[in-house]
């Protein structure tokens, strides 16, 4: 029986970490490398990756060995897609915003105030349109294995934000997302696209004034330390696509592929069920650390919705009205 170990407990560099990890795999086992950009624990994606590796390494012992590389140790999300096609890694879970070079359909998840809450996101993911959307990139060699939620996004800045006009003239870090860029412009603010690993330093040095993220990202990356509080807007979902290359998945023996995908499906359901509690816990940790969380009044929240929702019209043709309708209908189910 192999022992599962995260790359994070090895040396700080990949050159030192790689041999230590290789020793955890047995001769003849298929090595599955999973690269992601967040903390190894205490974060919904990091915890889900660990859970997946533990299940694979236990239940597929002798067949497969999964190694997890957190905190951009191997690749950031901008480089990992090429690495998947080259076979340098087998699994990644970038934010859905990161796939614009391959499909515009995932812009759906960036639309502001589309989903009411995480339960709505889960219902859409389980629906037929949501499942079909996993295959949006098969023509370029990628296949989605599941959606991993991280939570709803909040805004923070170096000054209090209560209504959109408070953000006028500020510079906000965003992911590589045209929807997010349009949303920030609708606030009268400026968008700056930066890699996740660069955000803390950019906030600390004033390269950007603010950012938008989940409670888990804000806490585990310590963004709250260099911001004047967080405004609880819940304006977007942050979700990740667990993705692999179609070539790698198709090359597995049928029984291995079936067992692996069954584990992936079960871990996805279990991990997503835990997100709301993890987000609430990290929100409380931010408060306990002495940061300020600003809760909007209904009138203030309406001002954010009114400012941002017109952005939908700019991207309706890219996404498809049918997908937008399916996502909206998930708010009314359950």
Give the predicted meaning of each segment.
Residues 1-5:
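Positively charged n-region of N-terminal signal peptides that target proteins for export
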Residues 7-15:
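Bacterial N-terminal signal peptides
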Residues 16-22:
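Sec/Tat signal peptide C-region and signal peptidase I cleavage site
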Residues 23-120, 128-334:
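N-terminal secretory/targeting leader peptides
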